[in-house]
């Protein structure tokens, strides 16, 4: 039997660095199959960090945000697994990492983006409609019965109350403070102190870099090959799509192709 270490091909293979790649696309929401949620991503993250002895885990992010809770859970999982496995993490922003998308990106050790990437929106929003006049116009009476004076707070079919709005703004302020504390902790020593970064404003990559919100401008393959070598292997881990999802994507692609041909 030939000892494994004496086989030239295997020796070369063993020297090649492996980088795990996880794509995070879409809205951040609980149970979002194919989107971004902690429960859906947990097994994928486990494989990305623990299989194949990776030199790093790269997260390719394209998200406008979503649930603050899911953003926090996903971000904390990234940091926790990185600490447990001692595997560094690098986020690469494609079109956008805004709001919850940036929350997750900032959980990585480093953040890179394209020149045209949109970064930031570090804020919290709640929106809705007031439809009480529409009901009155059509002579519709809505009947609601509750136990607990705040149970129907901000009902869109009732005129809003000042105390309800005050309560909601207080909740939003608390969530905003949690977001701010996360970013300050994750980007400690990197953030600009000359600009208010937490107004919900967005920036392109060049200014985001000046403000310390990202570490550099670059794409994931060139950046990682420069760091780990030209022979670096990329192993992508992704969610398995259901048959209906794959079928739906196929139909959409065929429809687009048909329109383009016409």
Question: For each of these PLM feature ranges, what is it?
Answer:
Residues 1-114, 125-262:
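N-terminal organellar transit peptides
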